[in-house]
Amino acid sequence: MVCLAFIRAAHEHLYLVRKVSHVCRCHQHRAWGSRPAASQFAVQGAPGRVLELLGKSYPQDDHTNLTQKVLSKVGRNLHNQKFHPLWLIKERVKEHFYQQYMGRSRTPLFSVYDQLSPVVTTWQNFDSLLIPADHPSRKKGDNYYLNRGHMLRAHTSAHQWDLLHAGLNAFLVVGDVYRRDQIDSQHYPVFHQLEGVRLFSKHELFAGVKDGESLQLFEESSRSAHKQETHTMEAVKLVEFDLKQVLTRLVTHLFGDGLEVRWVDCYFPFTHPSFEMEINFRGEWLEVLGCGVMEQQLVNSAGAQDRIGWAFGLGLERLAMVLYDIPDIRLFWSEDERFLKQFRLSDINQSVKFQRWFFQEERATGIQRKMGRQLCPFSKYPAVFNDISFWLPSENYTENDFYDIVRTVGGDLVEKVDLIDKFEHPKTHRTSHCYRITYRHMERTLSQREVSSVHQAVQEAAVQLLGVEGRF
């Protein structure tokens, strides 16, 4: 029999909707005994109601698509929790920039902002970065919207324009970012980015260059694969050289000397030329960051028309998983001491590798205590696989809507979701999807009975909230 608590949780937590007369803190919920109708939790949000987050109120509309699972992560700020692996990466990057790059008064050149609110306007997240109105990155299915005008930032780049407009020329921004995405060991709806920006005046860029006083930052020409229409080739090449030198030094600081690096041309709306940096780590090429010469239109609109600059962005989880051998992105949200205590280091630059097995004395028998502490597994508990298949509704279905339901109902019991089959009926032309959900707890073994209750709750929530027709 389906566990009603899971079903109620799906209805109660999937989309945060409240009557205006009952606006409250974002973690207050309806009583378990009152089971609301599925129509109250439509994917399109609840126009006329209000969402409260971080002390501010936001009217909901047809773009509201936040889940309680995601909202519960807002304010956790893992990157600011001392000794957390993401904090260690942030501190190592910050220390490197503080020590390597000094201003005229021998103070750090780069300022650091790691407590900016994750709630931004859609203008900040998209328009300020020159992202076109029809760009696919704006899709409701890929982002978490509070309403049409506000969202949880999809990247730390959302703060670039504001900080440039405030007169800053060199800064790092660190924060949690939110994207609707697939479910596997490498992806989570909340992750953390570190953004870097540096602007140069004509004097700063050409200082030390022979005949530098005769060189210019800007010209009127045509855009090419190598530069923007407003930049001189001399300026672009110097900015590009500085950017790549700064980032090569950074990854060498993190990974050690002798690291092999390569640059891959790519595209970002807010930089040109743009690059991805890859490193050869243990014989495998890994992408670690994206970067490029900032679009001058962005720089000009922020009030820095006399400067040219670069920007880069990297994912803290990606670096931490490689540096510390962390196998599953869910672990970053663990409060298990067996995980956290491994990163309490006296020196942030100390080498550490996550141990999947370790000694846990309290589980040992009396005889074992005499012989030594017991060796216990961490996150290697057996997986349980369950499939779900259903006919899609005629419209308004996205896979990310289903993934959000799975995350909301199953929480961190869900390790992975794979679309394993698509079928179109030859007569009705209806489409069916079949997903395989992998359940695995990070700290204990799950029973099939326990998983079946969660899985059945996922099935019912999908039917009631997405309008699919079950084939189970």
UniProtKB/Swiss-Prot annotation:
GO biological process: one example: phenylalanyl-tRNA aminoacylation
Alphabetically ordered keywords of this record: Acetylation, Aminoacyl-tRNA synthetase, ATP-binding, Ligase, Mitochondrion, Nucleotide-binding, Protein biosynthesis, Transit peptide
Chain ranges of the FDX-ACB domain: 379-471
The keyword Cell membrane is annotated on this UniProt entry: no
Modified residues (N6-acetyllysine): K202
Catalyzed reaction equations: tRNA(Phe) + L-phenylalanine + ATP = L-phenylalanyl-tRNA(Phe) + AMP + diphosphate + H(+)
PROSITE patterns (alphabetical): AA_TRNA_LIGASE_II, FDX_ACB
Protein name: Phenylalanine--tRNA ligase, mitochondrial
Organism: Rattus norvegicus (Rat)
Record gene name: Fars2
